[in-house]
Design a protein with these regions (language model features):
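Mid-core helix/loop region of P-loop NTP-binding domains shared across ATPases and GTPases
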Residues: 237-254
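Charge-patterned, long linear interaction tracts outside catalytic cores
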Residues: 371-384
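P-loop NTPase catalytic phosphate-binding loop
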Residues: 1-20, 63-67, 102-103, 121-236, ...
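N-terminal "pre-motor" subdomain/linker immediately upstream of P-loop NTPase catalytic cores
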Residues: 12-141, 150, 296
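Residue-level detector of alpha-helix boundaries and kinks
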Residues: 70-71, 207-208, 247
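Surface-exposed substrate-engagement region within the catalytic domains
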Residues: 322
């Protein structure tokens, strides 16, 4: 009699545990999809016939993440090769899937929606040299690019037409005009396409400006000469780089050398030689490149230049081949959706997926106009020529526009 009672009690406890486990899984969302059945049907398993096991599901406003524990022998590519079947199973667009791996765990991420990101001249204004470029789709945190950091020196922005390159460039330049004085940063702009950057010709920060392609060799040669003058000054004052010089001595500004659509200079050996010099030697002198192109192929950006550029902002590409040329294998730029949807690769971010900030032309013009009307008495920048001539630093301003 007592045995029957214990057996009945044990059965009840087992059933209760099963019910509790079932409801726990439902609460965690683990029963939403039968992944075990899916993996068997599409044959994601190892030689021992072991399958991935769903370990966790987490969601944010923008991304839903499925975490799987994978037995030895199952590769990340096994998931990627079946992205179409997995997207159908989850009832989502295939382009919204992201696959990644960390040791024995594989993550399938589903983009639920992209945040709306508008550059706000008040909210996004900063005192440092970090430039807000967008919001992380995974953490929703503001992603900053410090263009003065040695690990981030030089940048190219690349992607297909319509991906958002021009807007990204407008955000970067507008933010610097909005946040930094001319004693901190200045621009040398090659406006190859003659359209998107014309308003910056009138910005206080712009010291050199040209349109089209004629004369680019002389323009860049002058930049190299400026770099050489800066290094002579650094040597004279026993400083390793411009950052140290600015801390110890005077505020020579960082110079951002912007070249829009570098494909226009394909085959121009003089152009490539000067860009190569600036890419390999410019960082210490605070001469930093910002290059824009659809595709930085070898003919447009040789390895002697590309290997010295530490920041890549990749936007949507037509296919994985173009994505690999821009940001390396498995960079996944072909999965981006355009309109500022991007990935950043620099010293702090290894392919962080972001929704880039948007700035309208009207806001950009307002920032430039407001900056040009500022009548505050500000400490002026020192020029390399001033220091070369042994004049008292600060007596000569960089431009009458200051």
């Amino acid at each position: 009699m007592s045995d029957n009672v214990f057996e009945t009690l044990a059965d009840c406890m087992v059933k209760s545990c099963k019910i509790l486990f079932k409801h726990s899984k439902n609460a965690l969302g683990l029963n939403t999809h039968d992944f075990d059945k899916l993996f068997k049907e599409i044959d994601i398993c190892n030689k021992s016939n072991e399958f991935p096991k769903l370990a966790n599901i987490s969601s944010s406003e923008y991304i839903k993440t499925y975490t799987f524990k994978t037995p030895i022998g199952i590769k990340l590519n096994s998931f990627k090769e079946h992205s179409e079947e997995i997207s159908c199973f989850l009832n989502v667009d295939e382009s919204d899937l992201r696959f990644s791996r960390d040791k024995n765990k594989v993550y399938i991420k589903v983009i639920l929606k992209k945040p709306t990101c508008i550059y706000d001249p008040v909210e996004h204004k900063r005192n440092d040299f970090k430039i807000p470029i967008g919001y992380s789709l995974e953490t929703t945190k503001l992603i900053l690019w410090d263009f003065t950091a040695s690990t981030n020196a030089h940048c190219y922005i690349a992607g297909s037409s319509g991906g958002g390159k021009s807007v990204m460039l407008r955000v970067i330049l507008s933010h610097l005009v909005n946040s930094k004085s001319k004693r901190d940063v200045e621009f040398s702009i090659i406006n190859t396409k003659r359209v998107d950057l014309k308003d910056f010709k009138n910005a206080k920060h712009t010291v050199n400006y040209m349109t089209g392609i004629d004369g680019v060799e002389d323009f860049l040669e002058n930049e190299v000469d400026e770099m050489e003058r800066r290094y002579k000054i650094l040597e004279k004052y026993d400083c390793d780089d411009l950052t140290e010089f600015r801390e110890k001595e005077y505020k020579i500004p960082y110079r951002l050398i912007v070249v829009e659509e570098i494909s226009s200079y394909k085959g121009n050996k003089a152009y490539q030689r000067f860009i190569e010099i600036l890419a390999s030697q410019g960082r210490g002198a605070g001469m930093l490149l910002l290059l824009i192109t659809q595709l930085p192929s070898h003919e447009i950006m040789p390895n002697t230049i590309k290997c010295n550029i530490n920041t890549t902002i990749g936007l949507k590409t037509k296919d994985s081949i173009r994505s690999e040329i821009i940001a390396g294998s498995d960079s996944g730029l072909e999965n981006l959706k355009g309109n500022g949807h991007a990935k950043i690769f620099d010293g702090y971010n290894d392919g962080e997926e972001i929704q880039g900030l948007f700035i309208s032309k009207e806001t950009m013009k307002d920032i430039i106009t407001a900056n040009s009307k500022q009548n505050k008495r500000v400490k002026v920048a020192v020029t390399t020529k001033t220091l070369d001539d042994n004049k008292f630093p600060g007596m000569e301003v960089l431009s009458s526009k200051l």
